């Protein structure tokens, strides 16, 4: 067997390639901790300018178990003619300090939006396989998937760790609706967004993917993230069956 000799720097100096590797590790560590855990966002939902409900997005950690929750509820006056009661949960496991958040373990989506009902679950198994369960229609199927794949909820947290440059799309592999998607996320431009706490610099993104939940989307989805290392989602806008829904960050802990 041929022995490969290592590179040696001058005495007392660190070889350049080692410095490059160390810098890369530090960058990865910074990205992995780019947002806080626990973290919770609270949103006010408006429909054509009128308050229509509330939504939350939360992530917690106990040991190596990571849990992400997303909820949306319609206001009382909206529920009279269109009830919204959505809850999405994702469970991940932390296996390496250099991982963005963790590897998906379980994903459960339960939504009620008017007459639209969904209760489905995805179990991420070993060996690059997932089990899809439709709890309403009593359906269960197994699928082969790539090794690095996310559910719709954990994919958003992965997105927040990526470098976002205007005009340069990023891609995320995701399992949803019994299919593997290579989702393109367009990075559109930088904008200022006014919140109850003041004006913040943001970067506007547009995922080219229509997932279920959060007022059953009918059109494009736009998300405004703070233009800093935390990438806090401060605003969301999407078309629905009638009109559009805006979600604006109004509280939480982050």
Q: Which residue ranges define each predicted feature?
A:
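Exposed, low-complexity/repetitive linear segments and helix-based recognition motifs
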Residues: 27-30, 100, 148
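Hydrophobic, well-structured mid-protein blocks that either form specific transmembrane helices
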Residues: 116-160
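Bacterial N-terminal signal peptides
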Residues: 16-28
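Intrinsically disordered, low-complexity proline-rich regions
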Residues: 2-10
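Acidic, serine/threonine-rich low-complexity disordered tracts
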Residues: 33-126, 161-254
């Amino acid at each position: 067997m041929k022995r490969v000799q290592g590179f040696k720097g001058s005495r007392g100096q660190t070889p350049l390639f080692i410095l490059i590797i160390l810098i890369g590790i530090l960058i990865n560590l910074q990205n992995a901790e780019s947002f806080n855990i626990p973290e919770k966002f609270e949103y006010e939902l408006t429909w054509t300018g009128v308050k229509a409900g509330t939504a939350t997005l939360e992530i917690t950690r106990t040991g190596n178990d990571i849990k992400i929750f997303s909820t949306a509820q319609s206001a009382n006056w909206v529920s009279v003619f269109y009830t919204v009661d959505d809850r999405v949960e994702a469970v991940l496991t932390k296996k390496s300090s250099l991982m963005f958040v963790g590897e998906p373990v379980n994903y459960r989506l339960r939504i009620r939006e008017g007459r639209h009902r969904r209760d489905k679950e995805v179990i991420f198994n070993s060996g690059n396989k997932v089990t899809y369960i439709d709890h309403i229609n009593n359906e269960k199927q197994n699928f082969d998937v790539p090794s690095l794949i996310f559910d719709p909820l954990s994919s958003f947290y992965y997105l927040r760790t990526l470098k976002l440059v205007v005009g340069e799309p990023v891609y995320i592999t995701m399992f949803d609706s019994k299919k593997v998607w290579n989702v393109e996320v367009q990075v559109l431009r930088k904008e200022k967004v006014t919140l109850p706490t003041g004006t913040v610099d943001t970067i506007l993104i547009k995922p080219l993917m229509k997932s279920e939940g959060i007022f059953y989307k009918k059109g494009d989805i736009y998300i405004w993230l703070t233009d800093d290392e935390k990438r806090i989602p401060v605003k969301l806008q999407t078309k629905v069956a009638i009109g559009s829904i805006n979600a604006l960050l109004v509280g939480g802990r982050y």
